[in-house]
Regions:
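Bacterial N-terminal signal peptides that target proteins for export
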Residues: 1-8
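Bacterial N-terminal signal peptides
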Residues: 10-20
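Sec-dependent signal peptide cleavage junction
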Residues: 18-34, 643-644, 648-650, 670
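Acidic, metal/ion-coordinating pockets
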Residues: 28-322, 401, 406-409, 574-578
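Feature captures C-terminal
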Residues: 34-39, 49-52, 63, 144-151, ...
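A short C-terminal boundary segment appended to hydrolase-like catalytic domains
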Residues: 177-180, 294-439, 587-610
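C-terminal low-complexity, Ser/Thr- and acidic/Pro-rich disordered "stalk" regions positioned immediately N-terminal
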Residues: 605-647
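C-terminal membrane-anchoring or membrane-association module
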Residues: 655-674
């Protein structure tokens, strides 16, 4: 222990020795309890995002590792811990093309000692359990972070459950400036919800099993307390963080991942104590700063053997930082240049990783003998519009070269990867095409840039058909908008003016490309009955409404139960790799186009399958005895046959009724006159 001034300490020691006192009272004004806090900076679900960017007009952006260094250095004192709650090494192509190595290296080296620990998210297992377990220490200059998963057991290696970190603290007397040194020991335990493990590809987790995450955390927390930890923090990738926290004991705070939400709530744990539960969004859009308070009980003496620490978690607080905060710091008139230096220092570490990524992106995966355009040409002209419309309409000019076959390529890659019965991909997830010639990894990334992952789900044939039918209706409405926009542009207006006047449906991105089935569409049929034939490409069997099928799709559209209510009936089966990785795997094969053609299926149209043009209702001729004020007749477009006005049967019935009424009235008059 350190005591100042030294003269006061010497006097106390001498007096104590004379009196034979075993413990010594502090010569200054040492309080009975010292208030302090443990600062934990944290991230989750960054999904391979890594570089700072900011859109001032929208006020949104990505913090990235370089922005994180700015936020880290801007704190009044350095955070005590930097933790991550999973889904870190997989997502963006920058991460997946190096199998997570690029992200792991930045976590080790981006600033000071880098991260202290992370825990696996469900997507992080995409490179295999052994690769993930050793996903640290790539950099020779950084301090390796810990990969924690207390509930994972592997036949090929041991998973770490926890780490401890001892924090040096100093209290200073405000009057005589004497100081008192003490230590706070913090334990960190990590785990992944065992239910997430059940959806992972079996080959990726071969030899690895998952026990109850809550039980494993509780057991490890108890052990950490026995080892003298004053504060215990849990990092967990879990389906429902708040519910999960109610099952925990001996934990002061839960830093969660997986839900992609901003969470900041206090929950009562299984031991009756408060647990602060936090989560910081996703994709590095936010960074959290959790302050965990403690009271260090000194007993008013300089000895620390019998000192105790309590954590009043009810008083803890959380703050979220975004790219806007980074932008504000960089623009600070006093310290902005210092923060800019921090940013550039990390970017210098990112630069060689970017160069490696660019080299990988330029590698040729395979060749294409034809165009699979996104739009009218290789440049993607009108791709956004055409991927929502063209594939599902019989061409009026007989030109099939503009059909958006890129959707079929994508769906085929999903089928090839998973062996599923059917595949679907939403138009909003497609952002590029393939031109004839060499196909590079960069071309594939442009097609599927979002880092979405392939998943297989089970659903009935009836639910599949209902989703496809609704997609056709969305596409039909999109087609109407697009034709009106084209006509408006042809009349001399700009494309933006056309878009503003004839707007797209809000759910236009939910138009589905599909694969694994041969579909015949009859546009003369009403909504919900336009698919008149659907057979599987794998065996030629008819899609059975009562049968259950395996459907491969991306993890985004399958959760859209607003546009597709029947998706709520689906059951998740397996998680695979990223969508762009599936494309890379297909295009890298010899004769990949032949395989694609055999998997994709076809879209054809019934004998009467033409763009439905409703027959306009005839304008009624005004009677000389009626009001001749103009009346606007509004007709609603239908896809079936319009009802015919002036029906002959109705006219005969009406005439009979009128004649009968006249006869009755004449009879009454004749009777009264008699």
């Amino acid at each position: 222990m350190k005591r100042l001034p030294r003269l006061a300490l010497a006097t106390a020691l001498f007096a104590g020795a004379l009196a034979g006192i075993p413990s010594l009272a502090f010569a200054g004004n040492l309080p009975a309890a010292i208030d302090g806090s443990v600062a934990v900076m944290h991230t989750n679900d960054i999904h391979g995002s890594y570089k700072y960017s900011y859109n001032a007009s929208k006020g949104t952006g990505t913090v990235g590792f370089d922005g994180l260094a700015v936020l880290y250095s801007a704190q009044n004192s350095a955070p005590d811990l930097l933790l991550d709650a999973g889904d870190t090494f997989h997502g963006q192509s920058f991460a997946t093309m190096s199998e997570g190595k690029s992200i792991a290296e930045l976590m080790d080296t981006f600033y000071v000692d880098g991260y202290d620990a992370t825990t696996p998210g469900n997507h992080d297992w995409s490179y295999g359990a052994n690769k993930l377990r050793t996903m640290t220490g790539y950099s020779t200059t950084g301090t390796p972070f810990a990969m924690l998963c207390a509930n994972a057991k592997s036949t090929s290696g041991v998973w770490s459950s926890s780490i401890t970190k001892t924090l040096d603290r100093t209290w200073e007397d405000s009057e005589d400036h004497s100081t008192f040194d003490y230590k706070i020991k913090v334990g960190v335990v990590g785990a992944m919800d065992e239910s997430l493990g059940s959806s992972l590809r079996a080959d990726l987790v071969a030899g690895t099993s998952f026990s109850s995450a809550a039980n494993a955390i509780n057991a490890e927390a108890e052990q950490l307390r026995k080892e003298g930890c004053d504060v215990v923090v849990c990092i967990a990738h879990t389906l429902d963080a708040k519910t999960f926290a109610t099952r925990l004991r001996g934990v002061d705070a839960l830093i969660a991942g997986h839900e992609h939400i901003n969470l900041n709530e206090k929950v009562t744990g299984a031991d009756g104590k408060t647990i602060h539960v936090v989560e910081a969004g996703s994709s590095f859009a936010e960074v959290g700063m959790l302050s965990i308070p403690y009271k260090y009980d000194t007993n008013g003496t300089e000895t620390t053997d019998d000192d105790t620490v309590t954590v009043p978690a009810d008083d803890s607080n959380e703050k979220l930082y975004t790219a806007k905060n980074v932008n504000d710091l960089l623009a600070d008139p006093d310290k902005g240049s210092d923060y800019q230096s921090r940013l550039e220092a990390v970017r210098n570490k990112i630069k060689p990783l970017d160069e490696d990524f660019e080299n990988e992106s330029n590698k040729v995966l395979g060749t294409s003998t034809t165009n699979y355009f996104y739009g009218e040409d290789a440049a993607g002209t009108h791709g956004w519009e055409m991927v929502r419309t063209t594939d599902f309409r019989p061409s009026k000019e007989g030109d099939t070269t503009k059909a958006q076959t890129i959707g079929h390529v994508i769906c085929s890659s999903y089928l090839d990867l998973t062996g599923a019965d059917l595949a679907i991909e939403n138009a909003g997830g497609i952002r590029g095409g393939i031109a004839a010639g060499n196909v590079t990894a960069g071309n594939v990334i442009a097609i599927s840039p979002y880092g979405n992952t392939v998943e297989t789900w089970t659903m009935t044939g009836a639910d599949c058909l209902a989703a496809l039918e609704h997609s056709l209706q969305i596409s039909d409405d999109c087609n109407d908008s697009y034709e009106l926009q084209q006509a408006y542009v042809a009349a001399g207006h700009t494309e933006q003016e056309a878009h503003d006047k004839y707007k797209w449906r809000d759910d236009s991105g939910s138009v589905l490309s599909f694969g694994g089935i041969n579909v015949t569409i009859d546009w003369t049929q009403p909504e919900g009955k336009r698919i008149v034939s659907a057979t599987l490409t794998k065996d030629g069997s008819t899609l059975d409404p009562a049968k259950t099928y395996t459907v491969a799709t991306n993890n985004y559209i399958i959760t859209n139960t607003t546009d597709f209510p029947t998706f709520a009936h689906a059951t998740k089966y397996t998680e695979w790799g990223t969508c762009e990785a599936a494309l890379r795997a297909l295009i890298g094969q010899d004769s990949w186009e032949s395989k694609m053609a055999s998997l994709a299926g076809t879209i054809s149209f019934g004998s009467a399958a033409v763009d439905p043009t409703p027959t306009p209702a005839p304008t009624p001729k005004p009677s000389p005895k009626t009001d001749t004020t103009a009346t606007k007749v509004i007709t609603k477009k239908t896809t079936g046959k319009l009802a015919t006005t002036g029906d002959r049967t109705l006219a005969v019935v009406g005439a009979c009724l009128i004649g009968g009424i006249i006869v009755i009235m004449l009879g009454i008059i004749w009777k009264r006159r008699r």
